[in-house]
């Protein structure tokens, strides 16, 4: 059996042979001829066993062959002629076929070849240098998270960080360099990341699982069974929550609230700006001892004009930003910016507007809602999601 990576010309040669029409023509002709001979069935069976044993030594893909799935490859994914030949062969095979195509990420563009992770998802960039054209040098929410978790980890050695193959996107690169023994990249396996975090929490550590909202939904079962029902202290740092723009439709973070708010023992928070994200992360790690999620959007950590509003975070309590009469806008996270814009338009029409920073999406601050109801407000509650509780 092969242990290390296959090297040399033999695997390459056999891959070319198996991916050609002439190989399958010869195979069919020989097999049909042998079946016509006395004892042909036995001969064909012996040849198949010999072939299988040889393939296990020098060819990849045997897991699929053992399941009755034909395997073709590996094939150079940048060679169009070879790919066309392989696809023609695959059409001739009766049954399931796996075509193993090997590509080089960023192939043909040197900046992308040198830094494929950076070019996995990128906005506008200089095509000559490959440098991203940033609309602002101000820190993103991911940057704020990165700085704060490193700051807290310096003081508390029980803090560990987990990612599912996304240290760059989630801002954990710095943590991985500063605290390599407390950083865990589990690969593209969000389900395992959650259960792994649960195990560390059960052992007395303080795991922070940094993940994109759209990928967290893969781990719903583990969040429910392995973390929340067990009441374990796992912090979910949910990046790219809400609409993500240029990241594309597969990355839209609009479903996490729908399932997180339905799970028992789960607390969900959303910061109005970067400084509140820092405060929430500190609260979640140092002043809380149960499952908790902090969801924040893609991009720049907004300067909301509300920086002077920084009341200490108390569990389950909202923050009163502006208290007036007529209409109350209760908003969470980056929807505070929308609430401010709405307030300005309504003020032009003579309305007095109250703005409340919800902070905790779950649990809802019912005391605050009772306070607002006592003044006979018209209430509007704003989240960036498809549905919410």
Question: What kind of region is each of these model predictions?
Answer:
Residues 2-3:
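Hydrophobic, small-residue-rich alpha-helical packing segments that form membrane-like cores
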Residues 12-26:
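Acidic, Ser/Thr-rich peripheral helices and adjacent loops at domain boundaries
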Residues 33-54, 59:
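N-terminal leader/propeptide and maturation segments of large enzyme subunits in energy/redox metabolism
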Residues 55-61, 66-292, 300:
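Thiamine diphosphate
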Residues 87-90, 332-353:
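Long hydrophobic segments that form regular secondary structure
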Residues 300-319:
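Aromatic-enriched
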Residues 349-373:
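Generic long, charged, amphipathic alpha-helical segments
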Residues 378-388:
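Conserved small/polar residues in nucleotide/adenosyl-binding loops
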């Amino acid at each position: 059996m092969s242990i290390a990576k296959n090297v040399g010309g033999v695997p390459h040669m056999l891959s070319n042979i198996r991916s050609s029409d002439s190989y399958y023509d010869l195979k069919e002709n020989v097999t049909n001829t042998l079946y016509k001979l006395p004892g042909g069935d036995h001969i064909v069976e012996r040849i198949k066993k010999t072939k299988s044993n040889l393939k296990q030594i020098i060819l990849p893909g045997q897991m699929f062959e053992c399941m009755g799935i034909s395997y073709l490859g590996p094939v150079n994914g940048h060679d169009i002629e070879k790919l066309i030949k392989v696809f023609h062969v695959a059409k001739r095979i009766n049954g399931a076929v796996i075509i193993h195509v090997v590509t080089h990420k960023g192939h043909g563009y040197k900046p992308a070849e040198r830094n494929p992770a950076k070019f996995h998802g990128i906005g506008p960039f200089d095509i000559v240098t490959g440098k991203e054209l940033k609309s602002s040098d101000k820190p993103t929410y991911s940057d704020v998270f990165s700085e704060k978790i490193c700051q807290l980890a310096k003081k508390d050695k029980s803090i560990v960080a987990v990612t599912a193959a996304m240290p760059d996107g989630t801002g954990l690169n710095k943590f991985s360099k500063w605290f390599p023994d407390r950083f865990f990249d589990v690969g593209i396996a969000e389900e395992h990341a959650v259960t792994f975090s649960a195990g560390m929490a059960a052992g007395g550590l303080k795991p922070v699982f940094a993940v994109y909202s759209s990928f967290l939904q893969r781990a719903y079962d583990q969040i429910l069974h392995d973390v929340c029902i067990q009441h374990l202290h796992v912090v979910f740092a949910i990046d790219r929550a809400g609409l993500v723009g240029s990241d594309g439709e597969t990355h839209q973070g609009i479903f996490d609230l729908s399932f997180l708010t339905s799970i028992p023992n789960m607390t969900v928070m959303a910061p109005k700006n970067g400084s509140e994200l820092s405060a929430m992360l500190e609260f979640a790690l140092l002043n809380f001892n149960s499952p908790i999620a902090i969801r924040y959007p893609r991009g720049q950590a907004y300067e909301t004009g509300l920086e002077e509003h920084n009341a200490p975070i108390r569990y389950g309590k909202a923050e009163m930003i502006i208290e007036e009469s007529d209409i109350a806008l209760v908003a969470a996270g980056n929807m505070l910016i929308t609430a401010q814009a709405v307030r300005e338009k309504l003020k032009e029409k003579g309305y007095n507007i109250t703005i409340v920073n919800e902070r905790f999406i779950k649990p809802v601050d019912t005391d605050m809602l009772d306070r607002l109801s006592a003044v006979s407000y018209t209430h509007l509650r704003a989240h960036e999601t498809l549905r919410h509780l």
